[in-house]
Amino acid sequence: MSSLSRELVFLILQFLDEEKFKETVHKLEQESGFFFNMKYFEDEVHNGNWDEVEKYLSGFTKVDDNRYSMKIFFEIRKQKYLEALDKHDRPKAVDILVKDLKVFSTFNEELFKEITQLLTLENFRENEQLSKYGDTKSARAIMLVELKKLIEANPLFRDKLQFPTLRNSRLRTLINQSLNWQHQLCKNPRPNPDIKTLFVDHSCGPPNGARAPSPVNNPLLGGIPKAGGFPPLGAHGPFQPTASPVPTPLAGWMSSPSSVPHPAVSAGAIALGGPSIPAALKHPRTPPTNASLDYPSADSEHVSKRTRPMGISDEVNLGVNMLPMSFSGQAHGHSPAFKAPDDLPKTVARTLSQGSSPMSMDFHPIKQTLLLVGTNVGDIGLWEVGSRERLVQKTFKVWDLSKCSMPLQAALVKEPVVSVNRVIWSPDGSLFGVAYSRHIVQLYSYHGGEDMRQHLEIDAHVGGVNDISFSTPNKQLCVITCGDDKTIKVWDAATGVKRHTFEGHEAPVYSVCPHYKENIQFIFSTALDGKIKAWLYDNMGSRVDYDAPGRWCTTMAYSADGTRLFSCGTSKDGESFIVEWNESEGAVKRTYQGFHKRSLGVVQFDTTKNRYLAAGDDFSIKFWDMDAVQLLTAIDGDGGLQASPRIRFNKEGSLLAVSGNENVIKIMANSDGLRLLHTFENISSESSKPAINSIAAAAAAAATSAGHADRSANVVSIQGMNGDSRNMVDVKPVITEESNDKSKIWKLTEVSEPSQCRSLRLPENLRVAKISRLIFTNSGNAILALASNAIHLLWKWQRNERNATGKATASLPPQQWQPASGILMTNDVAETNPEEAVPCFALSKNDSYVMSASGGKISLFNMMTFKTMATFMPPPPAATFLAFHPQDNNIIAIGMDDSTIQIYNVRVDEVKSKLKGHSKRITGLAFSNVLNVLVSSGADAQLCVWNTDGWEKQRSKVLPLPQGRPNSAPSDTRVQFHQDQAHFLVVHETQLAIYETTKLECMKQWAVRESLAPITHATFSCDSQLVYASFMDATVCVFSSANLRLRCRVNPSAYLPASLSNSNVHPLVIAAHPQEPNMFAVGLSDGGVHIFEPLESEGKWGVAPPAENGSASGAPTAPSVGASASDQPQR
């Protein structure tokens, strides 16, 4: 339906409301689906008119449209069911269960069973989750609060919750104006016209000899001037505009450049009176990291407008309590992908987990499987999609702040969060550029593999840098940028010297498109006011000035052969356009059809093979043949795409990168692309046969079974994460032979002398009894320890000539740090026995706060000032383990000594959920932000997996213990997730094990034999390649995580003085550096902290043991804990 027809419905709704046709108003709201009357909906819910509630909702959404819709219908039907139970109307309750609630059983069978069991209770409030259910009135009110949040968050209700601002009786006014026009056209207008009907046009009868008065004196006509006839408002179309002036040719200036700017002209027909910008949509409980953007006004600040979705953000980012239900990924209203031509990439071949939301992507111009990615938190990643390996990951950092302008320094202090707006390769792939949302452009040189180096950093624009591109005017490689300061700038790519500044836009410049034709180099630019301008490299001003369809965010691109020009734009009210331009005439040649009525974000597009156009819209990828305006096909990528996904073809068009929800990138492939990726798999399997990684295979199975197809397996094999298996394409047969020779002489690396490694005992200004907890800060420049006497110790490395990075190192001692006030961070101990207390802490992502407890209240400390910000949750029960939610620092999982886990919201000071599944105190908690689960472990040696959407327990398993050891013997069991977020490490005094999460299956296990000392603690290295484990006899062992085989042993004599060699001093805790995979630290039972690194000449801890019998593991997948010496490598 056209926008004017839609507005006509609003006028009719206003008219009906003013005339008190109340039932008809709501019927039209429902049938048109244009306006959801929240007040009416609330009234019907409060009155319990459930049939009318669902009937009204059906005009806007269906049960299975998306997660929000399903949750809305579920809550309504659940309330209806509970009210029937409350009235003891069992037949009605059964009827509701069978007819209304049964549909949800396919999505959550356990929940449906639990609801069914309520029938067996005399009072459903006996169910713990419903124990606080009050009376019907209050329950409806509580439910309504949740329903409103869900409706506001639901993309299907976008633009439907706000009635347009209209003057009273707007429809009557328009009719009167129409009658005025009709009367003005009468040949013999009467002074007091008699309007008898609206069904036909008005016309005055003969004057009977009377002279008609002037229209100016006619009170009906007022002061309206005489005008020609106007065509009527069509039922489904806009007014026809008057003809535009003949447009100036876009290409005319190319053959004979002129310094005189052409007059501004229209790019085509202008729709009369387009719909106004909707009111800003509210985002309920949106996490702080959410990259969503409300509809901005025309003069709003342009920060990351190019890439952030308008209105409601992707479903995964909304902080609404959802049912743990998944849906098929079929895009709304699109047919399946079977109609797509074979040469379109339509098969999901890879799914990569980037870690933050992709905002821009670009394939290498030569290496067809090398993908560059920029994200909403300023990260850049370089992926080899063939092997699913992330070669490089870099976070945003200003290289030299002293050279930055004061506005930039002030902007970074005020708002340190920086997004990537665009990443792009140079034509030969030797450089790539990154444009950020704050002033900065960074250029890197690329030398193959993971070798990228800093090249240039340019403080390019005041405000955001919205686009970046490369061009070669006069055969000199240049970088073109544009920004919020309304300028386009050209920089020398070798030196960073500014060559040109183009000024003339009156709004922030959104995109640039350099090109050349007939030996003339030029640049197209688009701005947020919809203006398209063209520039020569001569500083003589813009050569053309056109209006882009949509008149807001527009990008331009040529076909691969440079002969056809296209643009893609999205207007402020969400209407999107892809058009082809006639360059010779400067006019739109064709407009492609098939966009959603209101795009849910700024649409991105790309071209391929000189034949196809593609755009990300409506949770899908839409394709057009360049020569036909009709939509060719739409592909949903097996579901899970963003509302307006970012897309990018590789140069051959065989692969298409598409951004999805939950920070993933899907790689779509055609038959050529699949063959290309298959060659990587063959090469990888051949070059890595001695190191087959069973865990990587299990990761794939885990991801699939969890409904995250390929999401977890994509993070590369555990064997290859440290660079050992990278660039497998370049592996020569001689390397395999060399490896075989080494395997014959491999032996365990023993470190027994201080000279065999770099170790350092940290200086001690304050003596403590023993170190109970230990962690490196996330920045990697400090270590935080919690002692058994509830005091925190902090050591910081200083940046100086000997330590240019300021990072932790075993080569230089740090300073034990305290604020000038001299205060200590000391936990509340209440009346607890220090020996019985279980100390625990958790550090925030930005290292600013630490949450800590030592048997008493939980304390929140400021890490800069050591001040206590808050204390809460006095015992009993006492906290025994703390973990921050990975997506929201305000949510904390707290393990308690009464065996429960409390999900606590710091902001509102409220326990949201209490999880029960263990029988003894909680000793470990770990979140997976890929699988959306929490894994817990306890002193009962039990492992539990909890869904973080509804906090239901998914499965549990008791850790197998050695024969002869009773399960009742208390011992801490700790858990830590692998980098792939699909596997986790289990640490018990009797064993190390790696488990697959979704099935809770043990994939690898290393057991402590009876003659050996127990394990005290263990942790993954930062890249999950290694496992560091400490033992009661003071040895520290380093294992390869791929197979849990021992590769290096650090004996006590290497770091403990001789005076302590016969004592009982040993490591209680061990911590890995967050960026250096071969650095770790231990906290000792005598209160000391030691940091370890291998010798610089070695660079790593020993050599991975060779494969046995063609396997990466010399042990069975899950040997018994009591395995004999022949089953286990010696320690």
From Swiss-Prot:
Modified positions (Phosphoserine) in chain numbering = S214
Q: What changes when the gene is disrupted? A: No visible phenotype, due to the redundancy with the other TPR proteins.
PROSITE patterns from the entry?
A: CTLH (PS50897), LISH (PS50896), WD_REPEATS_1 (PS00678), WD_REPEATS_2 (PS50082), WD_REPEATS_REGION (PS50294)
Expression across tissues is: Expressed in embryo and in extraembryonic tissues. Expressed in inflorescences, flowers, floral meristems, developing anthers and ovules. Detected in the vascular tissues, shoot apical meristem, cotyledons and young leaves. Expressed ubiquitously in the pistils, stamens and pollens.
Gene3D superfamilies assigned to the protein according to its UniProt record, in alphabetical order: YVTN repeat-like/Quinoprotein amine dehydrogenase
Q: Which Gene Ontology MF annotations are present?
A: identical protein binding; protein homodimerization activity
Complex formation: Tetramer. Homodimer. Interacts (via the LisH domain) with WUS (via the C-terminal domain). Interacts with NINJA/AFPH2. Interacts with IAA1; IAA2; IAA3; IAA4; IAA6; IAA8; IAA9; IAA11; IAA13; IAA14; IAA17; IAA18; IAA26; IAA27 and IAA28. Interacts (via the LisH domain) with IAA12/BDL (via domain I). Can form a complex with IAA12 and ARF5. Interacts with AP2 (via EAR motif) and HDA19. Interacts with TIFY5A/JAZ8 (via EAR motif). Interacts with SPEAR3/TIE1. Interacts with SPL (via EAR motif). Interacts with ZAT2 and ZAT3 (via the EAR motif). Interacts with JAZ13 (via EAR motif).
What Pfam families has UniProt attached to this entry? LisH_TPL (PF17814), TPR1-like_2nd (PF21889), WD40 (PF00400), zf_topless (PF21359)
Q: Where is this region: Disordered?
A: 286-305, 1100-1131
Q: Which gene encodes it?
A: TPL
Using the record's annotation, list all stretches that form the CTLH domain: 34-92
Indicate the segments forming the LisH domain, all copies. 4-36
What protein am I looking at? Protein TOPLESS
Entry keyword annotation includes Nucleus: yes
Q: What does the comment on domains in this protein's record state?
A: The N-terminal TOPLESS domain (TPD) (1-209) binds directly to a 12-amino acid LxLxL EAR motif peptide.
**UniProt-listed SMART domains:** CTLH, LisH, WD40
Q: Where are the WD repeats?
A: 353-393, 415-454, 460-501, 504-545, 548-591, 595-634, 639-678, 710-756, 766-805, 833-871, 874-914, 917-956, 967-1005, 1010-1049, 1060-1102
